Amino acid sequence: MNMLTALLVNITLSMLLIIVAFWFFQLNLYTEKANPYECGFDPMGSARLPFSMKFFLVAITFLLFDLEIALLLPLPWAIQMYNTNIMMLTAFILISVLALGLAYEWLQKGLEWTE
């Protein structure tokens, strides 16, 4: 019963906050609020320019390898085994999959800035 009450209160508060947020958004709409913030100065040109797809690919690659480090560092502590062969095999498989992905991206010229 307590869990049902807590769930009901959470859903009610969430819906109330969503409704209030949408209501206040429509009340205070003016052009200065819609402009991007640029260190307190007026924007120098359009701040809504599209960014390069090459930059996006390099950023995604960086995130993947950053995730690799986040997965590999706690691996010895996460696998509490006396046999380290399984842990080393798991780490090797993870690094191999990421290395194959990097090689594929390199061969497809996804990391080059000029064409």
Swiss-Prot record:
Membrane topology: Multi-pass membrane protein
EC number(s) per entry: 7.1.1.2
Class of this enzyme: translocase
Gene3D superfamilies for this protein: NADH:ubiquinone/plastoquinone oxidoreductase, chain 3
Keywords, ordered alphabetically: Electron transport, Membrane, Mitochondrion, Mitochondrion inner membrane, NAD, Respiratory chain, Translocase, Transmembrane, Transmembrane helix, Transport, Ubiquinone
GO cellular component, one term: NADH dehydrogenase complex
Subunit (UniProt): Core subunit of respiratory chain NADH dehydrogenase (Complex I) which is composed of 45 different subunits. Interacts with TMEM186. Interacts with TMEM242.
Protein name per Swiss-Prot or TrEMBL: NADH-ubiquinone oxidoreductase chain 3
Organism: Peromyscus sejugis
